[in-house]
């Protein structure tokens, strides 16, 4: 049987010094034969999705101790993409994913932890911890902080979120008073932003991967029911330890759960729920850590056969995460996908022998368990707060209308093809991605003139100065993993296009990426990026660009001779922005850029460059 990793520092005469230090942390004689379980907490007061996590690690720790484990908590960083948005702070967001992954690895391996509980929530934190968990391959359970409640104001007919505040701020016809009201109302509670943005998308995907408990992605941060997820996670991680170290059960390990089939299931869910395009980036990165063969080719194939079964903000103002939960959460969607023959339900999860078993219990459309029905009636209280588990409001009924409700059956899908697509062509030889769930059908085929900007800042200035006209394709380049560096999100450009009334009349193309809050014809992750010699670096103002989502094509409409000449000129000039940009790139960012791969590889670091 596998021996506890922690025995390296807790067993034998020569470890007296290490045990002395362990004792100084509170361990007693009877603790040295128990599993030492690391709790990676991402509490910070900078991020609303994490501001309520301070005491939750200790909540899990006490539960671990009750069932025979030793819990040791540590913290890692968390960047708020919304606060970092629109300035050089965004250069640090994606690289922070690697820092988070490394920090979890460092702590778990330096102290020989036997297992891991990951308390995450927002955009790069869940992916970073996921990468670390799959890299370490020790028993793990994910439990996130949960989504915030949607905002409400008498000045809007629909519920609000962060994007509404951004859009209204750029609307010159809106009064300062209206902007202030939206600002005060858009983010009323602690939790990850209330739509199907990157944070909530990733927390939902941990359910589909089998690494978190049902409800992890959709139970509100403020609701008392969420406390049970943390308590159950504490008990479950000790059970997983016993299954691995006591029984060598491979399905107690993350790589035994997050197999290729599980990654396909997670991507199927992502496509069906119209998740953030960032999830593609993060799943590709996680698959590499798990040593699973899963790339853009697999995602492209899935996108052609998986329908869209759920439509949530920013793709519609009608529904937010609280509505997804009322409709059955992730397992409501997984149940419909399973009945459509679109999932491998034989894969295990941390909490069930198989996904099929989990669906039978947790899908409200088929479950007769009254506790499950009650669980998914957990709803918002409409009270501004930063306190976790502070309310116990329940919807009077569930939304199980699979014809016209928030979650649809395959027969009544929002669209026959899902919410994400991979495009290829001479402008993106290695691929690019678009969230089709947020694109109006009238512009699924679009051709227009290029309006080229060498940075996000320049594009924002140009859009606000009315340089962009209806029919244009805005091209923002040298914002990829290497060229940015850091692959900035482009929420401000897309929000400002929307505020100018151009959301359905323009396209935006970039080697950067988009916030989960983005909608419209926004195409990101163009690979190769400009800094790596990608064709996007050859585009000039006025060039014609054709986008054909049904055909999965994106092309720069130039002859090969012209492209060859431009490429020769770029080789001679160097693949760098043609206009100066006031951007300070620190040594930390330079180190990331030196190793960064393109988006089609997950923007992970190419550590092969470091040698053996």
From Swiss-Prot:
[2Fe-2S] cluster binds at residues 122, 193. Its EC number is 4.2.1.9. Keywords: 2Fe-2S, Amino-acid biosynthesis, Branched-chain amino acid biosynthesis, Iron, Iron-sulfur, Lyase, Magnesium, Metal-binding. Pathway: Amino-acid biosynthesis; L-isoleucine biosynthesis; L-isoleucine from 2-oxobutanoate: step 3/4; Amino-acid biosynthesis; L-valine biosynthesis; L-valine from pyruvate: step 3/4. Its cofactor is [2Fe-2S] cluster; Mg(2+). The active site is at 515 (proton acceptor). One of its GO terms (biological process) is L-valine biosynthetic process. Binds 1 [2Fe-2S] cluster per subunit. This cluster acts as a Lewis acid cofactor. The keyword Magnesium applies. SUPFAM superfamilies: IlvD/EDD N-terminal domain-like (SSF143975), LeuD/IlvD-like (SSF52016). InterPro entries: Dihydro-acid_dehy_C, DihydroxyA_deHydtase, DiOHA_6PGluconate_deHydtase_CS, ILV_EDD_C, ILV_EDD_N, IlvD/EDD_N. The modification N6-carboxylysine is found at residue 124. Disulfide bonds: none annotated. Mg(2+) binds at residues 81, 123-124, 489. One of its GO terms (cellular component) is cytosol. Belongs to the IlvD/Edd family. PANTHER family: D-XYLONATE DEHYDRATASE, D-XYLONATE DEHYDRATASE YAGF-RELATED. Homodimer. Functions in the biosynthesis of branched-chain amino acids. Catalyzes the dehydration of (2R,3R)-2,3-dihydroxy-3-methylpentanoate (2,3-dihydroxy-3-methylvalerate) into 2-oxo-3-methylpentanoate (2-oxo-3-methylvalerate) and of (2R)-2,3-dihydroxy-3-methylbutanoate (2,3-dihydroxyisovalerate) into 2-oxo-3-methylbutanoate (2-oxoisovalerate), the penultimate precursor to L-isoleucine and L-valine, respectively. HAMAP family: IlvD. This is Dihydroxy-acid dehydratase.
């Amino acid at each position: 049987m596998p021996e506890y990793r922690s025995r390296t520092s807790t067993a034998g005469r020569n470890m007296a010094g290490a045990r002395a230090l362990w004792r100084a942390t509170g361990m007693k004689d009877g603790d040295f034969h128990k599993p030492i379980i690391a709790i990676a907490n991402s509490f910070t007061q900078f991020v609303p999705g994490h501001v309520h996590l301070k005491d939750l690690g200790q909540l899990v720790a006490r539960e671990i101790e009750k069932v025979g484990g030793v819990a040791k908590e540590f913290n890692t960083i968390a960047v708020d993409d919304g606060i970092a948005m629109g300035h050089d702070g965004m250069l640090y967001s994606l690289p922070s994913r690697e820092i988070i992954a490394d920090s979890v690895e460092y702590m778990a391996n330096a102290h020989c932890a036997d297992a891991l509980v990951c308390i995450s929530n927002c955009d790069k934190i869940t992916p970073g911890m996921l990468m670390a968990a799959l890299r370490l391959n020790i028993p793990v359970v994910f439990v996130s902080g949960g989504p915030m409640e949607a905002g409400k104001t008498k000045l809007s007919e629909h519920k609000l979120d962060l994007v509404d505040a951004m859009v209204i701020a750029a609307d010159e016809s809106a009064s300062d008073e209206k902007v202030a009201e939206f600002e005060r109302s858009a983010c009323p509670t602690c939790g990850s932003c209330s739509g199907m943005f990157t944070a909530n998308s990733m927390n939902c995907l941990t359910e589909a991967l089998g690494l978190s408990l049902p409800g992890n992605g959709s139970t509100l941060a403020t609701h008392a029911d969420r406390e049970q997820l943390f308590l159950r996670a504490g008990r479950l991680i000790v059970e997983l330890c016993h299954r691995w170290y006591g029984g060598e059960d491979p399905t107690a390990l993350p790589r035994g759960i997050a197999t290729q089939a599980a990654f396909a299931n997670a991507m199927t869910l992502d496509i069906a729920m119209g998740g953030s395009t960032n999830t593609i980036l993060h799943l590709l990165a996680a698959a590499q850590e798990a040593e699973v063969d899963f790339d853009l080719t697999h995602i492209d194939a899935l996108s052609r056969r998986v329908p869209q079964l759920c439509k949530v903000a920013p793709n519609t103002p009608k529904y937010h995460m609280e509505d997804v939960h009322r409709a059955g959460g992730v397992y409501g969607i997984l149940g419909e996908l399973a009945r459509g023959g679109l999932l491998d339900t034989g894969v295990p999860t941390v909490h069930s022998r198989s996904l099929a078993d989990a669906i039978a219990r947790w899908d409200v459309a088929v479950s007769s368990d009254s506790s499950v029905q009650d669980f998914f009636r957990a709803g918002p209280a409409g009270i501004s707060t930063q306190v976790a588990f502070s309310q116990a409001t329940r919807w009077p009924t569930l939304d199980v209308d699979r014809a016209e409700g928030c979650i649809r059956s395959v027969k009544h899908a929002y669209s026959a093809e899902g919410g994400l697509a991979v495009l290829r062509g001479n402008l993106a030889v290695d691929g690019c991605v678009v969230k089709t769930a947020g694109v109006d059908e009238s512009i699924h085929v679009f051709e227009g003139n290029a309006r080229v900007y060498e940075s996000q800042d320049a594009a924002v200035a140009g859009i606000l100065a009315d340089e962009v006209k209806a029919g244009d394709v805005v091209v923002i380049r040298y914002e990829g993993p290497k060229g940015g560096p850091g692959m900035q999100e482009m929420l401000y450009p897309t929000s400002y296009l929307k505020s100018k009334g151009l959301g359905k009349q323009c396209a935006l193309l970039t080697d950067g990426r988009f916030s989960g809050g983005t909608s419209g014809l926004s195409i990101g992750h163009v690979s190769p990026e400009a800094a790596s010699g990608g064709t996007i670096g050859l585009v000039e103002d006025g060039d014609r660009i054709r986008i054909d989502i049904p055909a999965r094509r994106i092309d720069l409409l130039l002859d090969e001779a012209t492209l060859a000449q431009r490429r020769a000129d770029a080789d001679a000039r160097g693949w760098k922005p043609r206009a100066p940009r006031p951007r300070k790139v620190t040594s930390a960012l330079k180190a990331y850029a030196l190793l960064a791969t393109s988006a089609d590889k997950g923007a992970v670091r190419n550590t092969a460059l470091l040698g053996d």
